[in-house]
């Protein structure tokens, strides 16, 4: 860690010189501790990720970045305690089992994991979960416990002001309909509404884009399929919207374990007076973009 500490300022100067305005830091270590120099010499000291020494280190990194107007997205971070209010360049972090555990974790994250995160980890602050794995495959072909539509819904249910398109480009080329939502979804929100939910079972979140009149909705479930009635009263009254719907297929047995790629993209006209019926497959989800039809953005 001392090698990082000694070079942080120089590294941030380099990034600033090349116009880099954001960095993602990481502190992966297999045994859960990082090494630092022993001031007395001899055997290096070992520090826990959430210990005081690492808390000071993370704050030092964010302060150095802030002086150069560089944003920080920390992986293997300390927990969010509200200091992102003091340092708004501390834009996101992980701080829980992220999508990478679906790539190589034994076991991977079960379907209820992301639902639980909405009621636990995400209450503390933004989480860089790195959704959008449309291949639904991890290391050595390990299946990710998710449907394709669920990967899109995670962009709305798990808040982060910076999001990743975390899959390979060739996989997005194979799923252009799904990738369209990733291109369109906002990350900077003006309003957030929790429409329904039970801890560990299901949740539906709606958010309004800060830079347009568009609304986005994400709904996810655990390993059980669900049929949810969602009133659209959050939409602007008196305005007709085009609902661009990305959902699990309903007539072809969509299921995260047996048929995760069953997927439908469709459009409907709706208003704030309507109620949508969301059919979520086991381990599935639904993502919707609501665009005003009056042409006013």
Predicted regions and their residues:
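Conserved, mostly hydrophobic/aromatic
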Residues: 26, 72, 157, 217, ...
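Aromatic- and carboxylate-enriched substrate-binding clefts and catalytic-loop regions
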Residues: 1-136, 143
């Amino acid at each position: 860690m001392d090698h990082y500490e000694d070079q942080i300022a120089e590294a941030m100067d380099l990034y600033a010189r090349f116009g880099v305005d954001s960095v993602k830091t990481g502190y992966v270590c297999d045994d859960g501790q990082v090494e630092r120099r022993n001031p007395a010499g001899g055997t290096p000291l070992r520090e826990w990720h959430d210990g005081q020494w690492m808390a000071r280190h993370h704050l030092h990194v964010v302060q150095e970045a802030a002086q150069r107007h560089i944003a920080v997205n920390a992986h293997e971070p300390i927990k969010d305690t509200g200091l992102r209010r003091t340092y708004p360049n501390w834009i996101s972090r992980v701080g829980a089992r992220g999508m990478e555990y679906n790539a190589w974790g034994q076991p991977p994250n079960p379907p209820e994991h992301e639902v639980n995160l909405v009621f636990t980890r995400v209450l503390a602050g933004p989480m860089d979960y790195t959704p959008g794995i449309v291949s639904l495959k991890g290391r050595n072909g390990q299946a990710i416990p998710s449907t394709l539509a669920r990967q899109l819904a995670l962009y709305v249910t798990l808040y982060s002001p910076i999001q990743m398109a975390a899959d390979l480009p060739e996989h997005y080329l194979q799923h252009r309909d799904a990738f369209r939502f990733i291109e369109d979804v906002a990350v900077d929100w003006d309003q957030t509404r929790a429409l329904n939910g039970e801890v560990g079972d299901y949740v539906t979140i709606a958010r309004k884009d800060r830079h347009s009149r568009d609304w986005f909705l994400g709904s996810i479930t655990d390993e059980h399929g669900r049929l949810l009635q969602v009133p659209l009263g959050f939409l602007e009254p008196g305005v007709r919207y085009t609902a661009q719907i990305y959902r699990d297929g309903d007539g072809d047995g969509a299921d995260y374990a047996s048929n995760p790629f069953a997927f439908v993209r469709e459009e409907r006209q709706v208003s704030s007076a309507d109620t949508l019926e969301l059919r979520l497959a086991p381990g599935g989800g639904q993502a919707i973009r609501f665009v005003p039809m009056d042409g006013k953005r």
